[in-house]
Regions:
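Alpha-helical hydrophobic membrane-insertion segments
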Residues: 5-6, 709
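Bacterial N-terminal signal peptides
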Residues: 7-16
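Intrinsic disorder/low-complexity segments
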Residues: 15-20, 31
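Solvent-exposed alpha-helical segments and adjacent loops
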Residues: 24-734
Length: 734
């Protein structure tokens, strides 16, 4: 019955596809139709979760104590917006043992006290909602919010480390901002702002629409793919979604337009077209504040040249228009993505830092520095010595003969620790990072192991001993802030590792863009975008390219775009394709159906008849299917297939979120708005540079009985050889 119900539910989705109770609330003081979201008001509401602004915070509550009374929250504002109203919504629970009225929470914005919330009896021991208005005049481009807990449990002789001193801030606590859009100058020196602003809302992926006059030509699609890859690199870890519009204005926001002499959107018909490749920043129609980035050219080849010029980091951007032609960069070597550790040279921690000040930390008792540590998804370790950290650091010396300890963790798993000197204020350490021989582990809880994306943390923890004394012999304690400074020249060294993977593997593709990102410039990647591709499916393809660039930190400026499966350029390439699911692709939710779909797709590609077998449906599911390329052995084809435009929009949104789809595995996945179902539906192959003898050992290491039999066979052969040798020796003497 359960299986039948589940099948009915899933088939309905896949047809044609293949509370918080609050006890107290306290308030502390023309020819072209305009887009649907026209600029009737330039105000925007956004909510920033406090937990999301804490490194590693996630959905966990924030706990303030007597020994750790402060928590900092860093956030930024876009250059083209100003705050007109700001309210901090705190959902918190205070210890019932606190003294009412004298205990309090101080709220600071950029170092200036905003308000003090007194913890009255009504607020102790139960959840309470507190609204704190903030002074909008104190907001800057880079901002820091601080909560300071001042708790008391007795009038005199208190111990700051007493366990009754605590305040818990719930994960739903948030900073609610009302911002007004500002009009910025048409100046390319601002680029990538305002189109991609790294100082914007970092809690959600960026969104940058692209507009075409209609279904674009192959050359225009290639230019758009180059730009999407550049956008993914610029958006960084937050990710980016790239919606596509055909001859229509997107809802109120900044956007990009590709235009040529023969393909110009209706809303630009009266605007002169520059001669040759050009990039121009201009005001968007029907908007007081939105901008459009016009990528223009006489032909589609000019559009490619314009994007390449924009991506040239050596070129100075200034003024409204860049009239220049760029060229394709030299092909890069394998596995040399800027964001990945490589064996060519040690990587400094300064290179791993994502923002200024990341190598510095302050705290009352444990200063923590956290850095990303990324590896190529197919990295294969052979020894625990493959990955080492050479660390140099400075710190505040412990006082009164207290102890201090440096702890190094990877993914919150302890790697090493050592006591630091109380006589010095600097130290060094050589740490071997945790490695289990073999492939990277996709399991975040596996230890010791490394994943493709890791969090390297260095924490300096200080011991504190407090004595309350007595009413007649009161002893006071002063909590001095502690500071840890990691030297930028500290290095992480990768050596002696290989590259080896079983492909296709959707988990590798979604986490690191592999195998396409093996060459970070995508020089061995081909995109298949049919001549009649829908705007939704083109959006999926472009967002996928942007996601790959986000994983490598490099724009894939050597990619290739083709329009059909008969193109000879598909040979010796890893292929990424987007399209519509064929009719009847999934009629039953089962492993067998998934395997049949994977086989069907592979045969359709091999027969070069994919476009002839596609159809349009009205469901809301998508399928990602990967299999070995029928054109070149050892290469991968990944197909992104949707049932409808709604499904394409859903898949594009989920691909834009770099933390989403982490549960996908195998070779085929069915993706719905609420769930993901993975299958091992296609044969796999191996790829990499692992020596043959290690391949043999890898193949048999998972079969202990086979290893035992092989050992017995070797012993028997060796014994037989020795026996025969000795027999010959005896016969020779006689």
């Amino acid at each position: 019955m359960l299986k039948t119900s589940l099948s009915l539910i899933i088939v309905a989705v896949l047809i044609a596809a293949g509370a918080a109770d609050a006890a107290v609330t306290v308030t502390a003081a023309p020819a072209l139709t305009a887009p649907a979201a026209a600029d009737t008001a330039a105000l925007r509401q956004k909510t920033l979760s406090l937990s999301a602004m804490v490194p590693g915070g996630g959905d966990h509550p924030i706990r303030l104590t007597g020994s750790e009374p402060s928590q900092y929250f860093d956030f930024a504002l876009r250059r083209d917006e100003a705050v007109v109203n700001a309210v901090l919504n705190l959902t918190m629970t205070a210890s019932p043992s606190l003294l009412a009225e004298t205990s309090q929470v101080n709220v600071y914005l950029n170092g200036e006290l905003q308000t003090t919330v007194q913890l009255t009896k009504a607020l102790l021991g139960q959840r309470a909602n507190v609204e704190v208005p903030l002074d909008v005049r104190r907001f800057r481009a880079q901002n820091q919010l601080m909560l300071q807990f001042v708790g008391h449990y007795q009038p005199v002789c208190e111990n700051p480390a007493n366990e009754v001193l605590w305040l818990s801030v719930a994960p739903e606590s948030a900073l609610k901002l009302t911002t007004e859009k500002l009009k910025v100058a048409n100046d390319l020196s601002l680029f990538p702002a305002p189109f991609i602003d790294a100082a914007g809302d970092t809690t959600a992926p960026a969104v940058l629409p692209i507009v075409f006059a209609g279904t674009p030509s192959r050359e225009t699609k290639e230019a758009a793919a180059l730009f999407a890859s550049l956008a993914g690199k610029l958006a960084g870890w937050r990710g980016i979604e790239i919606p596509v519009y055909y001859n229509a204005l997107p809802p109120e926001r900044h956007f990009v337009v590709f235009r040529t002499k023969d393909t110009d959107p209706d809303f630009l018909k009266d605007r002169p077209l520059p001669l040759g490749p050009a990039v121009t920043m201009a005001d968007a129609p029907f908007s007081r504040t939105a901008k459009m980035l016009l990528i223009s050219g006489t032909t589609g080849e000019d559009l490619n040249a314009a994007v390449l010029a924009l991506a040239d980091t050596k070129r100075v951007l200034i003024g409204e228009t860049l009239a220049a032609a760029g060229t394709r960069p030299v092909k890069r070597a394998a596995w040399d993505a800027p964001k990945w550790l490589t064996e060519t040279t040690p990587v400094t921690l300064a290179d791993l830092a994502q923002y200024p000040g990341q190598l510095s930390a302050k705290s009352q008792s444990s200063a923590r520095v956290t850095l990303p540590l990324n590896l190529a998804p197919d990295t294969w370790f052979t020894s625990p010595e493959n990955l080492t950290l050479n660390l140099a650091y400075r710190y505040t010396r412990p006082v009164n003969h207290a102890d201090a300890q440096l702890r190094v963790t990877v993914n919150d798993v302890l790697v090493d620790s050592e006591n630091v000197s109380t006589a010095e204020s600097r130290g060094t350490a050589k740490v071997t990072l945790p490695i289990a021989s073999g492939a990277l582990s996709p399991d975040a809880s596996a230890a010791p192991a490394m994943k493709g994306r890791n969090a390297l943390a260095m924490t300096l923890a200080y011991s504190r001993n407090f004595s309350e004394g007595s009413l007649t012999n009161c002893r006071s304690a002063s909590l001095l802030p502690q500071q840890l400074e990691v030297e930028p020249g500290s290095t992480v060294t990768l050596s002696g590792a290989y590259h080896w993977a079983e492909l296709p593997n959707l988990a590798m593709w979604l986490s690191g863009g592999f195998p396409y990102t093996k060459y970070a410039d995508l020089s061995e990647t081909a995109l298949v975008a049919p001549k009649t591709i829908s705007s939704g499916n083109l959006s999926v393809l472009l967002t996928s390219v942007a996601r790959a660039a986000q994983a490598t930190g490099l724009a894939g400026l050597n990619l290739t775009v083709v329009e059909d499966w008969t193109d000879n350029r598909l040979t010796d390439k890893d292929i990424l394709a987007a399209g519509t699911l064929p009719e009847g692709a999934l009629t039953d939710f089962s492993t067998r159906a998934a395997q049949e779909l994977s086989t069907r797709l592979s045969k359709a590609v091999q027969a070069k008849t994919w476009e002839k077998t596609s159809a349009s449906f009205t469901g809301n599911a998508a399928v990602t299917a990967a299999f070995e390329s029928p054109f070149t052995s050892g290469r991968t084809v990944t197909m992104l297939l949707t049932e409808s435009d709604e499904a394409a929009q859903m898949l594009s949104r989920r691909l834009a979120d770099t933390s989403d789809l982490s549960s996908v595995s195998g070779t085929l996945a069915v993706i719905t708005p609420d769930a993901v179902y993975s299958y091992a539906a296609a044969p796999t192959f191996t790829s990499g540079n692992l020596p043959w003898y290690r391949q043999v050992w890898t193949g048999v290491s998972g079969h202990p009985l086979l290893v035992s039999l092989a050992a017995l066979l070797c012993a028997l052969l060796a014994g037989t050889g020795v026996y025969r040798f000795m027999r010959r020796q005896v016969r020779g003497r006689s």
